[in-house]
């Protein structure tokens, strides 16, 4: 096993005192990345096996690398509400993840792990051994044929792990959808509705083209389209609604939302675990944000 290195988001590094800088957004979650150069080959990912991207990037975020020893020396859980571990499926990632979680498990901080689990047993082991609060099992691509093309694995098997994990760990499993990978609005709305039935929370991302990836020349989704998906998600999250109440054209584009109240200020905030803001993950500082980096309203306890 290689000597353990930990990558931390630049904003996390500023709060930890490792980097200098000023933050103009809420940042109650520490973001870490474990592993490097994935064994998988997702077309959009900077860490994909064949990607020629900067190894210190995930999406558009820079992740400064520090040693494990420097991390445990510098990390103060009192500065954060939650810590989120982004796990790259590289060789020996499980040993590196175990070491980090062993250090964190007795700290007074919520722990999230975002991972591509090998099987349900891996999910169960991480929850039971390390008392993690949440696990993100990212589908990314909600349409079956596109998923298998872009992510290179069987959709049904992955969905089985996702749904069965939620049955074992109710309200503790999240998944991600990346808007703009060729799917339709209908695909996304159907998926979010299906996840709600399985008590799985969906986090939305806007596709971000990264230099050196297979999809480096694919365009980002329009902000108008992304807002419609955010509003649709808000309606689904807060109401008992059916797919028939959404109006789509014959190409699967969302044309009309159901007649429910939408809290637009809340709907466009970053979606994810409690305390998650993911600043600039798929947003440029000088452009209108897809996801506003503010903490969503929730009930503590």
Across the structure, where does each feature detected by a protein language model lie?
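Auxiliary Fe-S-binding modules of radical SAM enzymes
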Residues: 1-28, 77, 190-301
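Conserved Radical SAM active-site core
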Residues: 14-23, 32-146, 155-170
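A short acidic, helix-capping loop that chelates divalent metal ions and anchors anionic groups
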Residues: 144-149, 211-215
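Conserved strand-turn element in the central/C-terminal portion of the radical SAM core barrel
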Residues: 162-186
């Amino acid at each position: 096993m290689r000597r353990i290195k930990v990558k931390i988001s630049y904003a996390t590094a500023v709060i930890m005192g490792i980097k200098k800088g000023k933050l103009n957004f809420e940042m109650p979650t520490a973001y870490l990345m474990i592993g490097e150069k994935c064994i998988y080959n997702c077309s959009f990912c900077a860490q994909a096996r064949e990607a020629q991207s900067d190894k210190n990037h995930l999406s558009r975020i820079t992740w400064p690398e520090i040693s494990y020893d420097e991390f445990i020396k510098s990390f103060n859980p009192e500065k954060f509400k939650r810590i989120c571990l982004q796990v790259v499926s590289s060789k020996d990632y499980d040993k590196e993840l175990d070491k980090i979680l062993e250090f964190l498990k007795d700290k007074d901080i919520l722990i999230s792990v975002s991972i591509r689990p090998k099987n349900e047993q891996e999910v169960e082991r991480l929850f039971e051994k390390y008392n993690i609060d949440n696990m993100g099992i990212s589908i990314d691509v909600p349409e079956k044929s596109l998923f298998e093309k872009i992510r290179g694995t069987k959709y049904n098997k992955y969905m089985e792990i996702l749904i069965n994990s939620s049955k074992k760990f109710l309200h503790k499993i999240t998944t991600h959808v990346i808007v703009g990978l060729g799917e339709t609005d209908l695909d996304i709305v159907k998926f979010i509705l299906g996840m709600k039935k399985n008590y799985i929370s969906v986090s939305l991302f806007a596709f971000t083209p990264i230099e050196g990836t297979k999809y480096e020349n694919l365009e980002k989704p329009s902000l108008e389209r992304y807002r419609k998906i955010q509003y649709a998600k808000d309606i689904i999250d807060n109401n008992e609604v059916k797919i028939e109440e959404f109006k789509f054209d014959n190409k699967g584009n969302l044309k009309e939302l159901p007649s429910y109240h939408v809290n637009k200020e809340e709907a466009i905030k970053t979606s994810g675990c409690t305390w998650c803001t993911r600043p600039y993950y798929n947003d440029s500082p000088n452009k209108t944000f897809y996801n506003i980096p503010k903490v969503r309203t929730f009930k503590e306890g």
